[in-house]
């Protein structure tokens, strides 16, 4: 797998679980002999929802809910076959979405 690059994109609602997952990936890749660039924090996506509190009237009384999606990007340059096998067997915390591009 010479001159290849693996790009891993992580998404999660909680930044602490996202950082632990990124830490595990970086540690595994460096242990197997690959060069790692990252984790690079990407912009946080923020969704805001405004809902009327009352069922039928009182439109002035509203409640706002917010959902933040944190993202990280990790590039693994020149991965070995050992690196790919170790990443496939890696156990990441639940709640982290992983997208891998070769």
UniProtKB/Swiss-Prot annotation:
Disulfide bonds: none
Pfam families registered for this protein in UniProt: Ribosomal_S10
GO biological process: translation
Keyword Ribosomal protein in record: yes
GO CC terms of this entry: ribonucleoprotein complex; ribosome
PROSITE patterns, alphabetized: RIBOSOMAL_S10 (PS00361)
Lineage top rank: taxon: Bacteria
This protein's UniProt keywords: Ribonucleoprotein, Ribosomal protein
GO molecular function: structural constituent of ribosome; tRNA binding
Function: Involved in the binding of tRNA to the ribosomes.
NCBIfam families, alphabetized: PRK00596.1, rpsJ_bact
Family: Belongs to the universal ribosomal protein uS10 family.
Identification of the protein by name: Small ribosomal subunit protein uS10
Source organism phylogeny: Bacteria, Bacillati, Bacillota, Bacilli, Lactobacillales
Record gene name: rpsJ
